[in-house]
Amino acid sequence: MTDLNLPSIFVPLVGLVFPAIAMASLSLHVQKNKIV
């Protein structure tokens, strides 16, 4: 069972991937509206 190892992988993954997606979508939104 990998249930014990899952949080140790899932938490850093969300902690790194989610902000990266948020920053990427934010930068695309700013470029699309040309708000500098």
Swiss-Prot record:
Any one GO CC term of the record: chloroplast thylakoid membrane
Residue stretches spanning the membrane: 6-26
Main localization, broad class: plastid
Location in or out of the cell: Plastid, Chloroplast thylakoid membrane
GO biological process, one term: photosynthesis
Annotated membrane topology: Single-pass membrane protein
A Pfam family it matches: PSI_8
SUPFAM superfamilies given in the database record: Subunit VIII of photosystem I reaction centre, PsaI
The entry's keywords: Chloroplast, Membrane, Photosynthesis, Photosystem I, Plastid, Thylakoid, Transmembrane, Transmembrane helix
Record InterPro entries: PSI_PsaI (IPR001302), PSI_PsaI_sf (IPR036357)
HAMAP family: PSI_PsaI (MF_00431)
Family from the record: Belongs to the PsaI family.
Protein's job: May help in the organization of the PsaL subunit.
This protein's name: Photosystem I reaction center subunit VIII
Gene giving rise to this polypeptide: psaI
